[in-house]
């Protein structure tokens, strides 16, 4: 019967399907998915359009707050000649500059370009905060032979050159010629006794209540240079403060340092030194002299252009430079300079290249001329380390308007770098300012002041 045959038919049907499947499985393998077509090469980055410059390399430049309009104009001129470099100017008050920059260094935030000074160089260079210029730029030493020795010394640490001079100058003794003549004197003081006698006469005759003013504010960075100049003028040769091994030589009664501080103490007590000196900074010192309130002062020479500026007051043109009073007439010569931090190299080759172009443009020669240095000299009366500029007719004419060029040159020849320039000099300087104040005010003896100065020096040296 048909129903009895169904299992057989089902069996045959299933068998046929199984065989077909096996035959299919033994056939050619299924084709692999097609390999992806190679991607078209990416189009090359578009070249800058013809005449279109790449973005300039940006460098920060930090200065103290003097002549900012002139600085920015010099930057503009530099950028016009070097469009691949962009300089960003930032300034801090001179009174705060050292501490502000130390704070930035310590915080890991140094600018690649900045102002430096001889009395901070050893501190900053030994800490690695400044970069020696002669390593990436060996050509910097080509300028060394044209620099005043005291200036080159002030930019050198461990035989490496750390700067190109922004300006270099002497600390000068300045007097009001009209007032001195009114008191009956025809010549400037040659000794500190002369200065005392003239000051007494000026005070007694009512010409000036306080014949002398100094910028001895404890925040005035140039005060130590004025103090050392008073010491140098009394001392002949090296060793006025420190010997060749940076050991103190000043801590003895009768030393030039003792005599200088004693003179100030006695002048303060006698009413010859204005008490305001102990809180006066340089700008106010200049204004006070211009007003006729004082006859004598000691200050950086570049201030002479401002003192004798036409129409600046009754005594414009009447302020004269004299050699520093004392047996040797020596004074301090100092340098402020353009410096570079290690950050410039960290920023790469383009930053280094722009840094050198900037440094040479500002502190070196452009087309064979010290263009920027000469501008500061002619327009602002800034002194300079670049000796060939003394022969420049424009400089001679400009300096002759506010000073006796022969006296300026004579004092420059007698100028000496500060002794004791070490990594701890800056810290000792700040300590010393306060100690000298105590002596002037009679809060402690001059010998106690000198002893404290020596003890602090030795403590710092031992660290």
Model regions and ranges:
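Short, low-complexity disordered leader/linker segments with a strong preference
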Residues: 1-60, 80, 448-451, 455-463
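Extracytoplasmic/periplasmic substrate-recognition and gating elements
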Residues: 80-81, 107, 181-183, 248, ...
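Glycine-centered hinge/linker elements that transmit conformational signals in sensory
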Residues: 199-200, 245-278
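Long, aromatic- and glycine/proline-rich binding clefts that accommodate carbohydrate-like moieties
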Residues: 319-322, 373-430, 438
């Amino acid at each position: 019967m048909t129903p009895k045959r169904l299992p057989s038919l089902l069996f045959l049907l299933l068998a046929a399907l199984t065989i077909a499947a096996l035959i299919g499985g033994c056939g050619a393998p299924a084709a692999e998915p097609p390999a992806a077509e190679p991607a078209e090469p990416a189009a090359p980055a578009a070249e800058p359009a013809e005449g279109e410059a790449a973005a300039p390399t940006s460098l920060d430049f930090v200065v103290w707050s003097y002549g900012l309009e002139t600085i920015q104009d010099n930057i503009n001129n530099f950028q016009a000649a070097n469009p691949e470099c962009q300089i960003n100017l930032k300034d801090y008050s001179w009174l705060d500059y050292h501490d502000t920059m130390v704070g930035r260094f310590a915080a890991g935030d140094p600018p690649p370009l900045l102002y430096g000074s001889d009395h901070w160089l050893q501190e900053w260079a030994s800490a690695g905060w400044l970069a020696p210029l002669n390593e990436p730029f060996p050509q910097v030493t080509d300028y060394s032979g044209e620099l005043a020795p005291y200036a080159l010394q002030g930019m050198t640490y461990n035989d490496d050159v750390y700067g190109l001079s922004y300006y270099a100058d002497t600390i000068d003794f300045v007097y009001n010629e009209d007032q001195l003549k009114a008191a009956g004197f025809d010549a400037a003081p040659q000794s500190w006794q002369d200065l005392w006698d003239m000051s007494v006469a000026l005070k007694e005759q009512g010409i000036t209540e306080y014949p002398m003013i100094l910028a001895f504010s404890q925040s005035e960075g140039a005060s130590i240079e004025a103090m050392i100049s008073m010491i140098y003028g009394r001392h002949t040769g090296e060793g006025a403060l420190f010997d060749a091994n940076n050991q103190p030589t000043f801590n003895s009664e009768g030393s030039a340092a003792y005599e200088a501080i004693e003179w100030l103490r006695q002048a303060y007590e006698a009413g010859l030194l204005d008490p305001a000196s102990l809180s006066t900074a340089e700008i106010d010192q200049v204004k006070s002299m211009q007003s006729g309130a004082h006859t004598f002062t000691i200050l950086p020479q570049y201030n002479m252009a401002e003192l004798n500026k036409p129409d600046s007051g009754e005594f414009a043109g009447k302020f004269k430079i004299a050699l520093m009073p004392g047996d040797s007439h020596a004074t301090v010569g100092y340098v402020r300079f353009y410096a570079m931090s290690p950050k410039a190299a960290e920023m790469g080759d383009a930053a280094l290249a722009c840094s050198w172009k900037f440094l040479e443009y500002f502190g070196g020669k452009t087309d064979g001329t010290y263009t920027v240095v000469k501008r500061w000299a002619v327009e602002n009366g800034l002194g300079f380390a670049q000796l060939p500029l003394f022969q420049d007719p424009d400089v001679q004419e400009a300096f002759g308007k506010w000073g006796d060029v022969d006296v300026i040159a004579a004092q420059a020849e007698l100028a000496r770098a500060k002794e004791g320039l070490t990594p701890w000099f800056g810290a000792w300087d700040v300590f010393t300012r306060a100690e000298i104040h105590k002596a002037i005010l009679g809060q402690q003896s001059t010998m106690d002041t000198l002893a404290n100065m020596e003890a602090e020096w030795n403590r710092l040296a031992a660290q």
